[in-house]
Amino acid sequence: MGHKVHPTGFRLGVTEDWRSMWYAGSSNFGEYLNTDLQVRNFIRKKLAHASVSRIRIERPAKNALVTIHTARPGIVIGKKGEDIDRLRGEVARLMGVPVHINIEEIRKPELDAKLVAESVAQQLERRIMFRRAMKRAVGNAMRLGAQGIKVHVSGRLNGAEIARSEWYREGRVPLHTLRANIDYGVAEAHTTYGVIGVKVWVFKGEIIDSDAQPAAGGEGARQGKG
């Protein structure tokens, strides 16, 4: 059976950047990594309804810079900046150093793989048919300029006794092309029947050879199941 390499890890240092930017010696590396995981989990839990896509952590000279990419910056900042000030204090206590928080707005959440996956997962939790949720996500992404998108769901779909996986794709999603700008996101839908996993790949075009980008509708829609 074939297994797909993680699209982000595959392109690190080529077209993708690291989500944690710092240097640590062998004695501090584990501590920094564990702290980063705790901070990310804390922020995602705290801002569960703020459509947070990515969290980037930098550690310049005994300080910390946390950049939160969100589609709803108003919820993160709060009234007169009260919420972000409170969040800054809580993150600083977790990290043990002064923290500065930047907010980056995501202009087109329909093209962000993580937010698309979370949107599909939320629809599945509201008992919307999985095929309708997948096709809606694919249609929105293609309408807003994606060159290709693939949505994959797996689990007890529609409450079936036997778990299975199904996917829907439109356009091109070249997973082996390093210069391809592939955004990848994962989410989970916690339904009454169990957990349904959602994976999304969004192809936004080629980064290096931008003059030779293929047309957005190069391939027709395909559907499959496993």
UniProtKB/Swiss-Prot annotation:
InterPro entries: KH_dom, KH_dom-like_a/b, KH_dom_type_2, KH_sf_prok-type, Ribosomal_S3_C_sf, Ribosomal_uS3_bac-typ, Ribosomal_uS3_C, Ribosomal_uS3_CS
GO MF entry, a single one: mRNA binding
This protein's UniProt keywords: Ribonucleoprotein, Ribosomal protein, RNA-binding, rRNA-binding
Ranges for domain KH type-2: 39-107
SUPFAM superfamilies in alphabetical order: Prokaryotic type KH domain (KH-domain type II), Ribosomal protein S3 C-terminal domain
GO cellular component, one term: cytosolic small ribosomal subunit
Top-rank taxon: Bacteria
Biological-process GO terms, alphabetical: translation
Record's keyword annotation contains Transcription: no
Pfam family, one: KH_2
Claim: rRNA-binding is one of the keywords in the record: yes
Known role: Binds the lower part of the 30S subunit head. Binds mRNA in the 70S ribosome, positioning it for translation.
Entry's family note: Belongs to the universal ribosomal protein uS3 family.
Quaternary structure annotation from Swiss-Prot or TrEMBL: Part of the 30S ribosomal subunit. Forms a tight complex with proteins S10 and S14.
Name of the molecule in the record: Small ribosomal subunit protein uS3
Organism lineage string: Bacteria, Pseudomonadati, Pseudomonadota, Gammaproteobacteria, Chromatiales
